Regions:
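Short beta-strand
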Residues: 35, 294-298, 330-331
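PLP-dependent aminotransferase class I/II
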Residues: 211-289, 293-296
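N-terminal small-domain helix-loop-helix segment of the aminotransferase-like
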Residues: 1-92, 99
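PLP-dependent enzyme catalytic core of the Aspartate aminotransferase-like
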Residues: 321-322, 331-366
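Short, conserved charged micro-motifs
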Residues: 47-48, 310-317, 348-351
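Conserved core of the PLP fold type I
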Residues: 60-183, 194-209, 213
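Conserved PLP-binding catalytic core of the aspartate aminotransferase-like
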Residues: 277, 290-322
Length: 366
């Protein structure tokens, strides 16, 4: 069976190893495995789940959802202050990125991304047959606007930027994003998966600039990674273009209900975000006191740190043996010998600090 020639050199996406497999490997009960590698919330969306339990008998799961997702767009309008015609509802933010590449990219076109950053920009663009041009970030992980603009050619159709950036946690000033959009004159997709943790957003740029598309999710701050709800924000004329390729029923009625329930209780989300930010700052200080690592500033719900003495992969393995699963980035360009950890509850963060201190002490003894 022959597949598209384009895919002949592709490798399967590196999905996270299931917790059951990790537990079997390290000899621990699966209940003791703590995922600090996915940047998901340690909090359950309690009030949304309570609303769902009360309404289960009334949800028409035997019917297709309203394909315009009008009710959810109304709630997002209230949350963002933007008009109903400004939204594209998606099955998670990744579907939003996929829609953008389908609308703007032809085979042979070019896309500009920075490095290091979220890998799906490269993957989604490559699937469309585009050539991905990578502009390295500076040593402090800030973007180089001049180099990005210099990389734009007549073949360039899109620029993808994550803000705050994954996996580095830094924030790009809105003025830099505005300049990129105005001077590049190509589609500028700004991924704001983590914006609630910093309180700063480029969404207002999409009020005036037709080429700005903001991509968001309810996975992180709203504690709904498993629900798979994302949305794009753009000018109405851009939304019309994006809706041309949007699947009509990719979001389930259960997911739609939970999304609306979460948006109906924003105080719960904001409280969880405040707790996470407080824990993040505590964790930055505590990790910064550990010899042998350097911790980078973050405006997200995760931290990136570099192992100075020893091998980050060995530290990663030792932590996994204690049931703490971090993201190993040690072989990723720009973040060599680095690990990334999700900010969790005080109890889990205490456990992480203690385990990391032991792992680094063992490393210095080798």
């Amino acid at each position: 069976m022959k597949i598209r020639e384009l895919f002949s050199g592709f490798e399967e996406y590196g999905w996270e190893t299931p917790s059951e497999e990790i537990a079997a490997k390290v000899g621990l009960p699966v209940e003791e495995i703590v995922r600090l590698d996915t940047n998901t919330s340690p909090f359950r969306p309690v009030r949304a789940l309570e609303d769902l339990a009360s309404a289960l008998d009334t949800i028409e799961v035997n019917q297709y959802p309203d394909t315009s997702y009008l009710s959810l767009r109304e709630d997002l309008a209230g949350y963002t202050g933007k008009g109903l015609d400004r939204f594209v509802i998606t099955n998670g933010a990744d579907e939003g990125l996929d829609i953008i590449t389908k609308v703007f990219l032809d085979p042979g076109d070019e896309v500009v991304i920075t490095a290091p950053t979220y890998s799906m920009y490269r993957i989604a663009s490559s699937i469309m047959g585009a050539r991905v041009v990578t502009v390295p970030r500076r040593k402090d992980f800030s973007i180089d606007v001049e180099k990005i603009l210099a990389s734009v050619t007549p073949k360039t159709k899109a620029i993808f930027l994550c803000n705050p950036n994954n996996p580095t946690g830094d924030f790009t000033p809105i003025a830099d994003l505005e300049r990129l959009a105005e001077e590049s004159r190509v589609a500028v997709a700004i991924d704001e998966a983590y914006f609630e943790f910093c309180g700063k957003s480029a969404v207002d740029l999409s009020d005036e600039l037709e080429n700005v598309i903001v991509c968001r999710t309810l996975s992180k701050a709203f504690s709904m990674a498993g629900v798979r709800i994302g949305y794009l924000v753009a000018k109405p004329e851009t939304v019309k273009k994006l809706n041309v390729v949007r699947p009509p029923n990719s979001v389930s009625v259960i997911s739609l209900f939970l999304a609306q329930a979460a948006l109906a209780h924003p105080d719960e989300m904001r409280g969880n975000v405040r707790s996470t930010v407080e824990e993040r700052e505590k964790l930055v200080r505590r990790l910064g006191e550990i010899r042998g690592i350097v911790v980078y500033p973050s405006e997200t719900n995760f931290l990136l740190f570099r192992v100075l003495d020893g091998d980050a992969s060995a530290v990663h393995g030792e932590l996994m043996g204690k049931g703490l699963v971090l993201r190993n980035l040690s072989r990723v360009q720009g973040v060599e010998n680095c690990l990334r950890c999700t900010v969790s509850t005080p109890e889990i963060n205490d456990r992480l600090v203690a385990a990391l201190e032991r792992a680094l002490a063992h490393g210095s003894e080798r």
